[in-house]
Amino acid sequence: TDLRGLDRNTDTVVWLGHSTYFVQLGGRRLLIDPVFSTYASPVFFANRAFEGTNLYTAEDMPDIDYLLISHDHWDHLDYATATALRSKVGQVVCPLGVGAHFEAWGYGKETVFEGDWYSVLEGKGGFAIHILPARHFSGRSLTRNKTLWAGFALVTPEHRIFFSGDSGYGKHFAEIGARFGGFDLAMLDCGQYDENWRYVHMMPEDTAQAAEDLRARALLPGHVGKFAIAY
């Protein structure tokens, strides 16, 4: 699909692999957790993308109104991708502490909206991006939990979309579902088949329950299909 050729007034969601999503909603174009590199780690030989899964590059993206980053792990925040997108991004939306990466990588401070859980970035016509709780952790290289992790709700008068980011199952899903009155679509963490990780990622049965808790009309599982992260 030629993403640049899509009518921006047509609401759509395109999963680009792993946790990367291209979203058009309410006349806005959003890109969530883009990783277009062939690896998701500090070194090129680790956590390599499966062959044939890098179908898009930063050059294939249209201008992006909002770049959403859920947390600063390598498979969600990629330096090469972020810098390649810089000239196309209107505003970055991220949880607390993550904005420092973008400022260090040449983004203007005025282009970064950084918020705590339950912060809201409001636009015209009833459009809003809500930064919401997740059960996870953060860190790059030797740092750990110096920045926040989050999910997002994308809201217009016509539609509500939820993105979990990385998250284990928890009561926050039911609380979010009640707060927003349900969602048209939930894009949820799924498929890291390691019981030792179940408090920071969801097994498939957890994902299904989270979708019910969120009162989602449709479920799009993610965090699969590109990297072998769990063993």
Give the label of every model feature segment.
Residues 34-36, 72, 134-135, 165-167, ...:
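Active-site metal-binding loops of divalent metal-dependent hydrolases
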Residues 2-9, 94-159:
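Metallo-beta-lactamase
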